[in-house]
Amino acid sequence: MSDTTAIANVFKLIEEYDIKFVLLRFTDIKGKEHGVSLPVNLVDEDLFEDGKMFDGSSVEGWKAINKADMLLMPMPETAVVDPFAQIPTLSLRCSIYEPSTMQSYDRDPRSIAIRAENYMRSTGIADEALFGPEPEFFLFDDVRFDVSMNRSSYSVDDIEAAWNTNKKYEDGNNAYRPLKKGGYCAVAPIDSAHDIRSEMCLILEEMGLVIEAHHHEVATAGQNEIATRFNTLTTKADETQIYKYVVQNVAYEHGKTACFMPKPITGDNGSGMHCNMSLSKDGKNVFQGDKYAGLSETALYYIGGIIKHAKALNAFTNPSTNSYKRLVPGFEAPVLLAYSASNRSASIRIPAVTNPKAIRIEARFPDPLANPYLAFAALLMAGLDGIINKIHPGDAMDKNLYDLPPEELQNIPAVASSLEEALNALEQDYEFLTKGNVFTQAFIDAFITIKRKEVERLNMTPHPVEFEMYYA
């Protein structure tokens, strides 16, 4: 869709749905969405040329207060009617621009994703990078947490939770709930959220996403997944933000709360965001070939780049301290940096396909707290580095990696074991990200500073488990 056609479509939607406000949405470094709403009478064609000024100093990691002015530049092709606004509202996703140069801001995650795609095209390796993330989430009935000088606690609860088998309910306990690790593809009445997910799917379709399936996930306490069709990198990152927005709002309307934390409960599976990837050139799948599992040599090199840079990638694909409570053996989390066909214990899997044209790779270590613009861009840059430098990943590992003896395990590299380790790796291994000025040094430094504050805060906070282990 050309800009002219896309802009015309914006005004068509405004008229068709009697839109009263236009919400300009943007994403910060941490992946959180923000928005500014404009009365519809202020929305004209000039908005798509001049943008809307806002205070960049109020967004963590962006501008100093003495250089705060920045521009929200709406992208007309992202226009979609907000299904949750009571007053008719049109949503437009924005990139961030510098008003002095009218160029994209180097710390804007969406602009980083666009630069990654442009860099890929400049190499001649591919025209399109296709991403298909699979974010998992929990639906809870009740979430509470308290952090102060003299106490620290949290609790989550859900009618599906295994710990509620003996709980007294006013209408009685019907006992239909998945036990620990017993929820995969459960059906009603054990799966209490089927209709909620179906409603999410219908709204996602209204907003332009293509739904492939939805189902209950492995964990107890309401773990779910909705699978959507792949798309090009930046567009899929946009769609991932829409996905989270819809899941959170539909849950809220049903008296539930959606949780995208990788490990909100102890002793059961966490939530991942497996990322399916392939490259396309002239309409052909670059990853299709005659090597292992139907991959091309280019695809193997792409895998090699991801494995080589995995610990640095973890800073973007697993950007929270909570992420590393998921990345431990025993809960279907892929911690070992190996690749294999259909082997879900490997961190990089080659899913089985019925059509060779659909061949792809799946990175299994990312989680849904990742900023999709940064995570997808970083994965692409690592893969491209592998292709350019012909980094072969070695032999595939087709055995169950969870059952390997210690002498074999020590020869297989692993993902980072903490956010601190991931940030240390990123400090040392970042040049593959700065090619083509995709990620700038200033952005990487700002990102590390923000994330180190999170690590330091957790490190300085006494934990209830410490009292259990050490108090008496």
UniProtKB/Swiss-Prot annotation:
Q: Which gene encodes it?
A: glnA
Question: What is written in the cofactor note of this entry?
Answer: Binds 2 Mg(2+) ions per subunit.
Residues noted as binding ATP in the record, renumbered to the chain: E212, N276, M277, S278, R344, R349, K357
InterPro entries recorded = Gln_synt_N, Gln_synt_N_sf, Gln_synth/guanido_kin_cat_dom, Gln_synth_cat_dom, Gln_synth_gly_rich_site, Gln_synth_I, Gln_synth_I_adenylation_site, Gln_synth_N_conserv_site
Q: What is this protein called?
A: Glutamine synthetase
Keywords assigned by UniProt, alphabetized: ATP-binding, Cytoplasm, Ligase, Magnesium, Metal-binding, Nucleotide-binding, Phosphoprotein
Q: Where in the cell is it found?
A: Cytoplasm
Annotated residues that bind Mg(2+) 1 are located at: E134, H274, E362
